[in-house]
């Protein structure tokens, strides 16, 4: 039905007859000549119909937005005065000779020209219309190019694309599972995989030493701008490769991806330990474009007569830190109050501050509600350590170390945006040496997942001091977003059982949930390591989209619903009976 895509027509086609199909983006009658912009996935081209061809002209006059049409015509150059530099095809136009209306369009339920006027609900309900917009089409085309580039790289490096099951067994990976009832085994359930983690490890044990898969994963968790109940991973696993080798190989893949598709050289991937990242940036995925850093000052204020400072400064679990914002002395009291409220979202009970109005004026040039508690010597030490200059403001965090990191880390990002401090476009990095476990409500939880190997210790040493263990894990971070995370895996049954025990998974439960893994670990398991990238997040960053919903064809809402299909929905009672499931109706009580 077509000879070319609309967006591909250019001056090399001058004088040629072409056949195009697509949708009417816009139609207008100017002085007895009908102009229409025809759109397909590759872009737009202008088509002109003049009255010389009466029947065709009259038909063209009836066209409205989103009519699906086929046109035949001759490519010609636009007059100099009508060249549109904003269009890829802006130097040419099609003189229409024939026109076929394939399908008319009903009045549109949403605006195609001013899509900002459409609600998120409307855009998702009529997604097939929203995806016709060039911006959305470009993102999905870009997504296809990314997956193609990834496949070429991995195929070329000896990786095998192997599928793993979608119907599997529930395993604890940090979020709730989506469950699928079994009709054959009534009362029993499959789970949709949160990741292919265990199956890809089993593939390593099977001898497939380089595996990859671009795979759907499912997590029933609270949603944010960068989360969806179903998402796509670039999943990678290797045998007989160290963490260093896995990082080198995947870094090479990411460099090639950005070079091929954006013509961007990502430069160096510096490495930073988890401890250093939390200390300097208050985050385990720091945005290195932001030059601001947290500075510890507990040693300077541990003896001041101010409990807000001296309490955390003398608490082994506490922290007192400062954040200098260049030119921040310009902040009004209301703006500081807004920053205080913002810090409160992350657990901070308040926000002490110090304005450096005039460094040369000594204490007279300093403004702060806590100045009366600080000696001139301490103030000078704080200014020296933070590098503050005249016109700057220093914000203070004093609390438990995790609260200070979260609150000042978030303020660091906010101030970086507010004061336009970001430097450079792309700043990749690796974060390494994560703790193996974290304490939550008195018990240990895996920082990554229960199959991550500790670095350089035996099962006995791990059991003796779990809190001190460092995992052999690594996260790739770009501009403050975690692109992917991975680790060396446990390949020893004793070590795996020890980790389960530390996590409170007793032997009987471990056998019930992971017996197949523990059994497999007994039969010559090779050392193996891997990594998984969030494909949706990578596309979001590379295209500049504000949400992963804008780089997925048919995403869910933030409440995990699909307005297009009205999913989820109620099941047929007959089907529920076959599955052995009874729905408990919520009974309304009379007041």
Curated annotation (Swiss-Prot):
One of its GO terms (cellular component) is cytoplasm. Belongs to the class-II aminoacyl-tRNA synthetase family. Type 1 subfamily. The gene is aspS. Pfam families: GAD, tRNA-synt_2, tRNA_anti-codon. Its EC number is 6.1.1.12. Homodimer. GO terms for biological process: aspartyl-tRNA aminoacylation. It catalyses: tRNA(Asp) + L-aspartate + ATP = L-aspartyl-tRNA(Asp) + AMP + diphosphate. It comes from Shewanella frigidimarina (strain NCIMB 400). This is Aspartate--tRNA ligase.
């Amino acid at each position: 039905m077509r000879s070319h895509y609309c967006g591909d027509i250019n001056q090399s086609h001058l004088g040629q007859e072409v056949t195009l199909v697509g949708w009417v983006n816009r139609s207008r009658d100017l002085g007895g000549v009908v102009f229409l912009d025809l759109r397909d996935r590759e872009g737009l081209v202008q088509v002109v119909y003049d009255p010389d061809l009466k029947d065709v002209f009259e038909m063209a006059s009836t066209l409205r937005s989103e009519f699906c049409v086929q046109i035949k015509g001759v490519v010609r150059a636009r007059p100099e005065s009508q060249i549109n530099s904003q269009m890829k095809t802006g130097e040419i136009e099609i003189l229409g000779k024939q026109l076929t209306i394939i399908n008319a369009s009903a009045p549109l339920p949403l605006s195609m020209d001013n899509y900002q006027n459409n609600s998120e609900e409307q855009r998702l309900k009529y997604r097939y219309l929203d995806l016709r917009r060039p911006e959305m089409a470009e993102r999905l085309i870009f997504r296809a190019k990314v997956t193609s580039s990834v496949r070429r790289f991995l195929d070329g490096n000896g990786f095998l694309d192997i599928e793993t099951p979608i119907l599997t067994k529930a395993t604890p990976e940090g979020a709730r599972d989506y469950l699928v009832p079994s009709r054959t085994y009534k009362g029993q359930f499959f789970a949709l995989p949160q990741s292919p983690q265990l199956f890809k490890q089993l593939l390593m044990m099977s001898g497939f030493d380089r595996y990859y898969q671009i795979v759907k994963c499912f997590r029933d968790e609270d949603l944010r701008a960068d989360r969806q109940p179903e998402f796509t991973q670039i999943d990678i696993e290797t045998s007989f490769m160290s963490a260093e080798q896995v990082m080198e190989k995947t870094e090479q893949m990411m460099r090639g991806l950005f070079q091929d598709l954006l013509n961007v050289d990502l430069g160096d991937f510096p490495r930073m330990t988890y401890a250093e990242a939390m200390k300097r940036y208050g985050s385990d995925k720091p945005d290195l474009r932001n030059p601001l850093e947290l500075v510890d000052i507990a040693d300077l204020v541990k003896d001041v007569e101010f409990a807000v400072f001296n309490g955390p400064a003398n608490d082994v679990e506490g922290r007192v830190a400062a954040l200098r914002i260049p030119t921040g002395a310009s902040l009004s009291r209301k703006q500081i109050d807004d920053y205080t409220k913002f810090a409160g979202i992350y657990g901070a009970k308040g926000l002490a501050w110090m304005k450096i109005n005039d460094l040369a004026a000594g204490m007279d040039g300093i403004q702060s509600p806590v100045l009366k508690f600080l000696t001139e010597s301490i103030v000078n030490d704080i200014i020296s350590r933070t590098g503050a200059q005249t016109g700057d403001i220093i914000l203070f965090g004093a609390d438990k170390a995790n609260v200070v990191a979260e609150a000042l880390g978030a303020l660091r990002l906010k101030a970086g945006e507010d004061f336009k401090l970001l430097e450079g476009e792309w700043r990749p990095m690796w974060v390494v040496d994560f703790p193996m476990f974290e304490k939550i409500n008195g018990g240990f939880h895996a920082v990554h997942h229960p199959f991550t190997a500790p670095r350089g210790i035996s099962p006995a040493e791990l059991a003796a001091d779990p809190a001190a263990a460092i995992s052999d894990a690594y996260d790739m971070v770009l501009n403050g977003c975690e692109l992917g995370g991975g680790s060396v895996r446990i390949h020893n049954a004793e070590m795996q059982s020890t980790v389960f025990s530390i996590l409170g998974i007793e032997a009987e439960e471990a056998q019930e949930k992971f017996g197949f893994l523990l059994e497999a670990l007994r039969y010559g398991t090779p050392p193996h390591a891997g990594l998984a990238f969030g494909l949706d997040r990578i596309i979001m960053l590379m295209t500049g989209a504000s949400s992963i919903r804008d780089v997925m064809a048919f995403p869910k809402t933030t409440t995990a619903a699909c307005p297009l299909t009205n999913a989820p929905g109620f099941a047929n009672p007959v089907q529920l009976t076959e599955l052995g499931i009874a729905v408990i109706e919520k009974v309304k009580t009379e007041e």
